[in-house]
Every structure is written in structure tokens, then in C-alpha cells.
Amino acid sequence: MGKKVVIIGGVATGMKTAARLRRRDKDSEIIVLERGPELSYGACGFPYYIGGEVKSFNSFDHTPQGAKRDSEYFRTVKGIDARIGCNVTAIDRPAKKVTYVENGEVKELAYDVLVLGTGSTPVRLPLENADAKGIHSFWFPWDVHAVEAEIKERNVTDVVIIGAGFIGM
């Protein structure tokens, strides 16, 4: 019998790890806990979409064959239990269990192997009016849609980018 693998984080690192593990190990139970509402998208490609080089936003969260990479897809196609809306609040390493909140309910999940693939979060600058209209993070799919809508609505031609990571560059 395989091991029970819990992966915290279901975007790039977490889902890639889960898929790779499944290819190498058909017997282990693989559970992914993702805090947000979306799984498996490629945020580093978002600037290419805004810039017009990538034509369809679906290319970030769909397979090349057009299937949306959501919980149902990972369960039926990959044999991975990928759960969205699960905020991990504690890790008890000696007891090998994680505590998380799903739909307001506190739950625990035991594991044999734990993988942390939580990624990062954009830094909001501690400045006055940092949340004013026209100031956006550019990390999550909904950020991209907000930026795209504002560009069209206000006919934006000039922008300032703060950040020199893969997305900012």
C-alpha cells in the first residue's frame, strides 16, 4: 500500500509536484490543499497575456486539449484529490497531521509525507493610497482580469511596474 502524501499549495509547485509524484507512484494517496479558489495556473505567463502575446487566458488553467485543470480534472484524470478553499492553519510534525479550515469547518488530516508548495504573496507597499483605483497586484487570475478591464476602461497607455521578479519583468 502506498503512502498518504499531503501537499499544501495547489498552484504551480504543488500541482506539478502532485502530478509528477502520481506518474512515479500509482499507489500513494495524494491530497492537495489549496487556500484559493483556483488550481494549477501559470502566473509567470500573465504579462504575456496582458501584452497580447498569449491570446487566450484559458492557456493558463486549461490543458492543451482544452480541459480546465480543476478539482474534478485532477481527481478523474490524474487520480489526485485536489481541494480548493482549504486554509491550512497548523502543522503538527510529530503527530504527522495538518489542521485546515474548509467551508468554515476545522478539519485535521494525517499524512505520511508532507510537501510545502505554498508559493508567495505579493507585497503591498506600506504607502498612503496603496489601494487606490489604478493600483493593482498582478499575481492571481482575478488580478489579471482587473488590470485588463482597467486598461480597456481607461484606455491606459502608460504603466509603472514595481517589482523585478519574473512577473514584474
List each model region and its residues.
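Beta1-alpha1 glycine-rich phosphate/pyrophosphate-binding loop at the start
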Residues: 2-81, 123
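Short, well-ordered alpha-helical microsegments
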Residues: 14-15, 124, 144, 169
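FAD-binding core/adjacent interface of flavoenzyme oxidoreductases
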Residues: 1-8, 68-159
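A broadly tuned preference for mixed-charge, low-complexity surface segments
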Residues: 57-67, 84, 90, 163-169
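Flexible loop residues that form catalytic
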Residues: 35, 119-120, 164
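Glycine-rich adenosine-cofactor-binding loop
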Residues: 7-14, 159-169
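Generic structural "secondary-structure junction" signal
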Residues: 41-43, 48-52, 59, 90, ...
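Glycine-/small-residue-rich active-site loops that bind phosphorylated ligands and cofactors
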Residues: 13, 38, 90, 106, ...
